[in-house]
Amino acid sequence: MASSVRLVKKPVLVAPVDPTPSTVLSLSSLDSQLFLRFPIEYLLVYASPHGVDRAVTAARVKAALARSLVPYYPLAGRVKTRPDSTGLDVVCQAQGAGLLEAVSDYTASDFQRAPRSVTEWRKLLLVEVFKVVPPLVVQLTWLSDGCVALGVGFSHCVIDGIGSSEFLNLFAELATGRARLSEFQPKPVWDRHLLNSAGRTNLGTHPEFGRVPDLSGFVTRFTQERLSPTSITFDKTWLKELKNIAMSTSQPGEFPYTSFEVLSGHIWRSWARSLNLPAKQVLKLLFSINIRNRVKPSLPAGYYGNAFVLGCAQTSVKDLTEKGLGYCADLVRGAKERVGDEYAREVVESVSWPRRASPDSVGVLIISQWSRLGLDRVDFGLGRPVQVGPICCDRYCLFLPVRDRTESVKVMVAVPTSAVDRYEYFIRSPYS
C-alpha cells in the first residue's frame, strides 16, 4: 500500500528578506534551450536527532530560505517566454519561492530501496499546489519515524546541477547559523550573456542532435510500457573490477579508465542488452559535461546558470553488446575528450533561436551525475542526508552519492518492466 503525504500548513511564498532588484533578467541560450524545460527535483532524507523541535526547525528553514534568496533573488522571480519567442527571461519582483510542510507515514528506510513506481514519491514535492510554479519550491516532510524528507525543485532553465548544489549548501549553512551570508563563497554570479549566441554559421557535427531511425518501436515502448525503477549500489571493489574488465577488453596502450567511464559503459551496455533491440539499431549515451573551465576564458566562480553540454557516445546494438566493456568505456572517453571551447560554442549556436536543436529520444539513454555535486554535504542542522535521490525515478539514469562511502555510487534508472529482470542480471554479471 502506498504511503500517504498530507500538508499540515497552507503553502506559502517566501520572499527575499531584504530588498532585491526589480528587473527582468535574460536567460542564456543554453538556459533557454528546449531540452531544459523541466525541473531538477531532489529528495534529501535526514535521520533527525531525537527530540527535534519541528516548529523551531521549520521556522529556521523558512528564515534561511528568505535570507538565501537575497543573493539568489532570480529564484524568487518568475520565468516567462520573451515576446519575440527567441528565449526565456526571469521577471524579478520578489514574488517568492514556494515552501510547504507536510507529514507522512513513510520512514527513512523506505528510501533505501527503489520506489515501487516512477511517481511513488511525487507527493514529497507538491509543486502543483501553486497556480504558477516558482523557480524554486521546497517541501519539508516529517516522516513517521521522526526523520525528515526535504524535497527541492528548481527550474532547470534558471540553474544547473552545480549551481543548485551551491545554493543548497548556502541555504543549509544559513539554517544552522554556521555561516554569515557575507562570508559565503562563491558569490552567485548571473552573467548569462557569456553563453549566448555569437551568430556563428560554420558549425561542426554534433551527434547528440542527430536523428537515427527507430528500427524497434523504441519510442512506443518507452512511452506506453510501464517503467520499473531500479536501484543498485556499486562499491569501490565493484568499480575496480569493472576497470579491470574494461582494460582486459580494450585496445593496447589505453590509459586506465575512470570510474565514470567504466560505470557509464557498463550501465549502457547492460541496458541495451536487456531491451533485446535489433542489432542494427543505433544507440546513444548522452551525459552532461561541465564547461565552466572548458570554455575560454573560463566562466567566473559562482556562475549558477546552465554551464554544461551533452557528451554523446554512439554505436550500434551489435557493437555495443559484442565488443566488451573496454569498447564502451572508450566511446564514453572519446565523447568527453571532444568537448572543448570550440565544441561548447557550437552547441550554444545549435540550441539558439532559430536553430533550436534538441536531442531526439530514439535509442537514447541519458546519464546525470549527481554523485559529484556535493548534495551529500547539505546539512540543515540535522546531520548529513542519509539518502540522496530524485523525487521521481524515470528513464533518466542518475549516479547518486552514498553516505560515508565516497568511492561508492548508487545508480537509479527506470526500465521497461519486461526488461527489468534482464537488466538487473546483466548489471550483476559483468563477465557475461
Curated annotation (Swiss-Prot):
GO molecular function, one term: acyltransferase activity
Name of the molecule in the record: Alcohol acyltransferase 9
Enzymatic reactions: 2-(methylsulfanyl)acetyl-CoA + butan-1-ol = butyl 2-(methylsulfanyl)acetate + CoA; ethanol + acetyl-CoA = ethyl acetate + CoA; butan-1-ol + acetyl-CoA = butyl acetate + CoA; butan-1-ol + propanoyl-CoA = butyl propanoate + CoA
InterPro entries with a match to the protein in the record: CAT-like_dom_sf, Plant_acyltransferase
Alphabetically ordered keywords of this record: Acyltransferase, Transferase
Bridged cysteine pairs (disulfide): none
EC number from the UniProt entry: 2.3.1.268
Induction of the gene: Induced by ethylene in ripe fruits.
Location of the active site: H156, D379
Chain's role: Involved in the biosynthesis of volatile esters which confer kiwifruit flavor. Alcohol acyl transferase that can use a wide range of alcohols as substrate to produce esters. Exhibits acetyl-CoA:alcohol O-acyltransferase activity.
Expression (tissue specificity): Expressed in fruit.
GO biological process: alcohol metabolic process; fruit ripening, climacteric; response to ethylene
Similarity section: Belongs to the plant acyltransferase family.
Pfam families named in the record: Transferase (PF02458)
